[in-house]
């Protein structure tokens, strides 16, 4: 099964289970009238909406690139995550509003022990599904699955906190505990929504992934070949599960086209080995210039004009510049 199809299959399960958990949580709310349980139920509405939005985005992202979308449809995942983050934040605000109302005008609570058991079951299911979703998303580089997994895990921990609060309420009878729990976890939900939204906007705006670039630079330095005289103008863009890498690779000027292409192929094989097969590599090969002899450690070079002095270590700062490197 391809990565895109696997992502789609997992998201189908997420959407289906979210509907089931939503029903269970609303049964618990109508049985107890607890605003803390309502907090959980409202977030489950977001889970359902986000699950189906994520499902659609993965369906779109799985489409092959076409004439209108030469880089594919991967950015649909970023849009999905942005909507999900917004929905999570909105749910948090609604929960705070409802909790404050209940602090001012308390309502009678019923069957708290019954509600505790129901939402405990949903917490267990959420944790299992969220863990599997997050693991698959990280393995397949799917932002939509990662967002869904984080969302479900957040829901799990908030449910656990709500259960603890409801147990205290059950034994003490203090009604204000119900609303206080709801407000605390609503703030946590809003924070989670912000983080998901921030990540998705970074993807939409093609913000540089510093962690990914740093790892790539480390891999290139460690596995540097003798004919890779220099590397510059390195850029990485991620569209869904596909990584697009482009750079300028300087090779000895006397290599023929076939030999230069072998060096480009070696670069592609190295990056795919470390980052997976979902990769598009665009490399512009440059011939070396006399001033670069000082940074070239090729031992059998027949055209050397200057003695080798020092190999320049590639860093995040110098490898991204559109400029050939030289010793000052």
Where do the PLM segments sit?
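Alpha-helical transmembrane segments and adjacent TM-loop junctions that form the membrane-embedded core
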Residues: 2-17, 24, 30-42, 46-328
């Amino acid at each position: 099964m391809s990565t895109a199809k696997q992502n789609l299959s997992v998201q189908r399960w997420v959407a289906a289970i979210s509907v089931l958990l939503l029903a269970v949580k609303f049964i618990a709310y109508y049985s107890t009238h607890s605003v803390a349980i309502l907090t959980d139920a409202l977030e489950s509405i977001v889970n359902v909406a986000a699950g189906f939005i994520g499902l659609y985005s993965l369906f779109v992202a799985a489409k092959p690139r076409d004439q209108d979308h030469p880089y594919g449809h991967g950015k649909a995942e970023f849009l999905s995550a942005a909507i999900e983050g917004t929905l999570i934040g909105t749910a948090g605000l609604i929960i705070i509003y409802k909790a404050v109302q209940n602090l001012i005008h308390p309502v009678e609570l019923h069957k708290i022990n019954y509600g505790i058991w129901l939402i405990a079951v949903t917490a267990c299911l959420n944790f299992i599904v969220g863990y599997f979703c997050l693991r698959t998303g990280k393995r397949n580089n799917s932002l939509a699955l990662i967002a869904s997994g984080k969302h479900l895990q957040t829901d799990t921990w908030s449910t656990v906190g709500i259960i603890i609060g409801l147990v205290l309420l059950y034994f003490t009878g203090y009604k204000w505990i119900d609303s206080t729990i709801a407000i605390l976890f609503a703030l946590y939900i809003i924070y989670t929504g912000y983080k998901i939204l921030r990540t998705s906007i970074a993807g939409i705006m093609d913000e540089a992934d510093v962690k990914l670039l740093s790892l790539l630079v480390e891999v290139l330095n460690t596995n540097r070949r003798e004919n890779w005289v220099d590397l510059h103008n390195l850029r990485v863009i991620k569209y869904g599960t596909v990584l697009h890498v482009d750079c300028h690779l300087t090779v000895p000027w006397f290599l023929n086209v076939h030999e230069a292409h072998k060096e480009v192929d070696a670069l592609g094989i190295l990056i795919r080995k470390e980052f997976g097969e979902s990769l598009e590599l665009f490399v512009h090969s440059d011939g070396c210039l006399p001033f670069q002899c000082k940074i070239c450690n090729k031992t059998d070079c027949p055209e050397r004009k200057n003695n080798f002095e020092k190999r320049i270590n590639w860093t995040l700062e110098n490898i991204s510049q559109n400029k050939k490197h030289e010793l000052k």
